[in-house]
Amino acid sequence: MGVAGRNRPGAAWAVLLLLLLLPPLLLLAGAVPPGRGRAAGPQEDVDECAQGLDDCHADALCQNTPTSYKCSCKPGYQGEGRQCEDIDECGNELNGGCVHDCLNIPGNYRCTCFDGFMLAHDGHNCLDVDECLENNGGCQHTCVNVMGSYECCCKEGFFLSDNQHTCIHRSEEGLSCMNKDHGCSHICKEAPRGSVACECRPGFELAKNQRDCILTCNHGNGGCQHSCDDTADGPECSCHPQYKMHTDGRSCLEREDTVLEVTESNTTSVVDGDKRVKRRLLMETCAVNNGGCDRTCKDTSTGVHCSCPVGFTLQLDGKTCKDIDECQTRNGGCDHFCKNIVGSFDCGCKKGFKLLTDEKSCQDVDECSLDRTCDHSCINHPGTFACACNRGYTLYGFTHCGDTNECSINNGGCQQVCVNTVGSYECQCHPGYKLHWNKKDCVEVKGLLPTSVSPRVSLHCGKSGGGDGCFLRCHSGIHLSSDVTTIRTSVTFKLNEGKCSLKNAELFPEGLRPALPEKHSSVKESFRYVNLTCSSGKQVPGAPGRPSTPKEMFITVEFELETNQKEVTASCDLSCIVKRTEKRLRKAIRTLRKAVHREQFHLQLSGMNLDVAKKPPRTSERQAESCGVGQGHAENQCVSCRAGTYYDGARERCILCPNGTFQNEEGQMTCEPCPRPGNSGALKTPEAWNMSECGGLCQPGEYSADGFAPCQLCALGTFQPEAGRTSCFPCGGGLATKHQGATSFQDCETRVQCSPGHFYNTTTHRCIRCPVGTYQPEFGKNNCVSCPGNTTTDFDGSTNITQCKNRRCGGELGDFTGYIESPNYPGNYPANTECTWTINPPPKRRILIVVPEIFLPIEDDCGDYLVMRKTSSSNSVTTYETCQTYERPIAFTSRSKKLWIQFKSNEGNSARGFQVPYVTYDEDYQELIEDIVRDGRLYASENHQEILKDKKLIKALFDVLAHPQNYFKYTAQESREMFPRSFIRLLRSKVSRFLRPYK
């Protein structure tokens, strides 16, 4: 906005001034001068000063006399009392005694110092500020303090970037700015035709050779403590008249014989000057040497009164101010840490806590409320958090979950074949064998299938693919004979809305039963699995919540039909029989499709009538949002039924598993039947949460023909780690065990004991290193554990799950916000990996990057590094490059419109790596953003550093930077609650200066 567009406050000030002056003017108008208009004769003395009847100047003191009054100007003013004018102490040759700037104020003056200096205790001299003491001056490598300023320096092989703080690795070849011999003292800019152009940092001038930079008085006062003059040879230093030059030619020392001198040239008259000097010599005032006060001086009727600002205490001499160590008293009021600084103190918090805006209290950071904290479940603890994985998954990299390959550990406990599946596994048997009830052992099949066993069916539910999944299981006890051929097929139905349910298949006798082989006992035996993935549709009247929204539902039905070898005839061989059965199966599927389409597919489970409907049910606003499958309402929340219970739809609550059943998972709608022992008197326990709770099972180290008592101990040379098994595993290689009833391979008497990272080979009787992609944390094992999911190890012989790493490069690249992430973060990244990202923002937008922290091992001699350039060329303009660990955050803008980013690691040491967020902003704000990120105050305070590490606060800042209109989403109160006052003041001053540059 131009000047003409601003409000002109002149008229308002005139009205205000008139109102302030009106009462005194009225009093003066009614006052009578002494000796006029009074009655003759002796009268009581009137105190004109007390009644305000005097005509002394506003800057004068009124002293009552027996017959009148006397006016005299206050210290710091001159005149005869009825007219007083301010003395300009800064106008003399000594500049008021100030070595830098002297600011005249009514009745007094104040000394100020240039940037890079601080006022000494005498209130006149200026001392250098050592910026390197606070957070290394914000320098990435080395900070060097100089008079009036500081400089960042880089280690050998690096040069200082444009932001004057970070260091960039030099290239060995090429003619661009990335070459170590480009010749520029400060800033190198790419020029046309492959050449370079040099520029200097603010406060320096480019030398005639167009390469070197000459210091001027505009940068750090030219390195001079007091006065600086620019000459052809550079800055020339001089000292205030009351000081003498140090031998270093820059510092100034106080003279011992200095006295205050007043010359005729800087006084109104010689007489007035003499009076003023005499008065100040006779009476100590704040106008002379600040009254001797360290900080604040105030003239009173009894002389000067010294006081100290908050954070200091006045000493016994009544002049000196001493810093108060607030941390010595009740820890400064800080919850955790207190750090004393000159004139104040800072509170800090332990890791995992954040400082609240009162800048004293610490609050636990709820990491679980942030995005991307854990792959599956997150558990918040005071000061930390823990990730947990769903059943069938293993935690790696602290926060990630990968599928567990159960088959890699003792073949999953399977007697014959183990097949790993996502989130689970299953045991299978060779032809001629059937799976035992314990789902691990295999039993030889003898004779034909029985025809009189009534099937038992249950529905198993759990989380799958982000939703609820229900799996129909048959426990009919019907087994396949060795001459049976299996035909499998599946069909999927898609519906708009439905409810998981289960009922006998007799609902479709007209089509389904005739389609099945006649030699089998029941159609129900043909349902091997039915997979229902849907919303339960269960509504709880009267409970608070939103009405459920229509959801799509998928029902996958998988049929497994059996054909018997005895059906083969001379005219139709086994292949012919299979084709006929497939034809019947397709007919059965068509019948089922029609039933679903006609809404004749009705199922029932646990007292609930659960239907499949083509139209979504009507819901009232009072009806609560439906809970997931296997969940009930408790205190207006959906709670999964715990292990050992199931959800009963009729009673709408969790019920204990009845005798003879068990359930080892949460959120189920049925209980599994306990295996039936030959001894019918075996103990059955209600609320069984595991198969072993059913009672009567053989214990680890034991076995029997059916897995139930009576049991035998595993023979010498065998072991069994699980309960309810029908056999024991051999040690192999002719190895014996230390005793009967062994429960693990570690009980086998091997010739050598293998250390972690190895497994015992029973053929060669040697210890073999675990191959790449596996690990073994224990002694004396005969296997190695496969790494979870898509992870692998860097080398063979791994001993811990932490050595399993995901090699995928992480990150999300958006037009406005995004992040890049090293592989396996926050776990250690893998060896010999390479990642590249390209950030190409929309037109007229620039890139701001925040590196909260980065962990790269310095021991590798820069074998692992992160670099950000304009292009992949090593000679292109580089914005950032590092090969070290920095736990102190830094923010910077890209030197180019787009960024090519590369992370590379060698085969040496590893570390956590990084997660680096970025935001793109309107290029019109370039000057403002640069001003903010280059200000050392952004990083000086540990509290400010924590802001740049706080994912929630960074997200809010980036949200506003990317889309400024989002600023209005945050109220002023919210902003104050999110950020400390010092941070808001810093940003407000810079934004105000950016928006109103002429004020």
Swiss-Prot record:
- Residue limits of the CUB domain? 809-921
Q: Which UniProt keywords apply?
A: Calcium, Developmental protein, Disulfide bond, EGF-like domain, Glycoprotein, Lipid-binding, Repeat, Secreted, Signal
**What compartments host this protein?**
Secreted; Cell surface
Organs and tissues of expression? Expressed in a broad spectrum of adult tissues.
Which SUPFAM superfamilies does the record cross-reference, listed alphabetically?
Answer: EGF/Laminin, Growth factor receptor domain, Spermadhesin, CUB domain
Instruction: Give a Pfam family name.
Output: Ephrin_rec_like
One of the GO BP terms on file: signal transduction
Sugar-modified residues: N659
Residues of the region (Interaction with the cholesterol-anchor of SHH) are 847-856
Q: List the disulfide bonds.
A: C49-C62, C56-C71, C73-C84, C90-C102, C98-C111, C113-C126, C368-C378, C374-C387, C389-C401, C407-C418, C414-C427, C429-C442, C809-C835, C862-C883
**Occurrences of domain EGF-like (ranges):** 45-85, 86-127, 128-168, 177-213, 217-252, 286-321, 323-363, 364-402, 403-443
Q: Name one GO molecular function term.
A: calcium ion binding
Q: What is its main location?
A: secreted
PTM description: N-glycosylated.
Q: Which GO terms describe its cellular component?
A: cell surface; extracellular region; extracellular space
Q: Which residues form the signal peptide?
A: 1-31
UniProt cross-references to InterPro entries, sorted A to Z: cEGF, CUB_dom, EGF-like_Ca-bd_dom, EGF-like_dom, EGF-type_Asp/Asn_hydroxyl_site, EGF_Ca-bd_CS, EGF_dom, Growth_fac_rcpt_cys_sf
Q: How does it assemble?
A: Forms homooligomers. Forms heterooligomers with SCUBE1. Forms heterooligomers with SCUBE3. Interacts with SHH via the cholesterol anchor of the dually lipid-modified SHH (ShhNp). Interacts with PTCH1. Interacts with VEGFR2.
Domain description: The CUB domain is important for the interaction with the cholesterol-anchor of SHH. The CUB domain regulates protease recruitment and activation during SHH shedding.
> What is this protein's function?
Lipid-binding protein required for SHH long-range signaling by binding to the dually lipid-modified SHH (ShhNp) and by promoting ShhNp mobilization, solubilization and release from the cell membrane. Acts by enhancing the proteolytic processing (shedding) of the lipid-modified N- and C- terminal of ShhNp at the cell surface. Synergizes with DISP1 to increase SHH secretion. Probable cell surface coreceptor for VEGFR2 involved in VEGFR2-mediated angiogenesis.
| Record's protein name | Signal peptide, CUB and EGF-like domain-containing protein 2
